[in-house]
Amino acid sequence: MSEIIQNFIPVKEIRNGYIETFDNRLIKILEIEPINFALCSEDEQIAIIMSFASWLKIAPVNIRFKSVTRRADICEHIKSLRDDIKRERNATVENLGEGYISLIEEVGMKEALTRRFFLIFESSTIIRLTSDISRAYSEMWAVEQAAKNYFLQCGNKIIEPQDEDEFTAEILYMLFNRKMSENKPFLEHVKSRVLDIMGEKNLKYGTDKIPDIPAVEFFAPREMDFSHPDYVTVDGTYYSFLYIRGNGYPACVRAGWTSVLVNAGDGVDIDVILKRENRNKAVDSVSQKIRLNRTKFKNTQDTSGDYEELS
């Protein structure tokens, strides 16, 4: 693995479902099962918004919501249908089944999309000493449990995998290897990497002991190219990044406004990045603007207490 890839993916270890980085941060990725917000009643939508707003008040300092849109994998569904057709004795039903499969294949190639939604957050504790590790893990566990409870109130379940380390590595593999992951399942890729690394060390699989392999080897792409100013290339896929500033989107929006972004289409990821600011600084900044505006329009003097009354 090249040095540029190692620097771009500073993952030191994946342990207990948490990502430890070389700059001493602890990161967690949770996958959220979505609901159809548009089909909820007005009262249900209000309840969901209030629960989500309550969670944001206690959310970690740095959080990221990420949606990934890809072509739907219809192979398993088609395989299941073909197995059913093989057991079917009625020729008419068999013909209808074949027609249904043809329709799925045609639609699947053009329109079938699948979306995955992730919540990503990190510990506010920087791991510098051994004693920091347990504190950081305790903090992250508490944040994770709170997120599960609040999102459940919103109607969203957090996926709980049997093997959290494998689940986390599989997500990273999918994110960094968009092209390869469509054709090569994660576990198959892991076995392939083990064979490659053992071959490089002149070790024989099945006879010699498998050496210690850094976790990043199992999800890092084979190639990354940052030489072009307008795009990057990762795993044979071209990426462009568009950034909407915090004040570049209307501050007042209707419920469900993110669906416009999420439904942008195949190959479009949406990242919403939130960072908690220092409340005292925010109060001072907002109250100063309030005083300036009121002084300008009303020619009066105000204090920072006005902001407290409004908040």
Task: Tell me what each language-model feature is.
Residues M1-S311:
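Extended, folded cores of ATP/NTP-driven motor/assembly subunits in large transport
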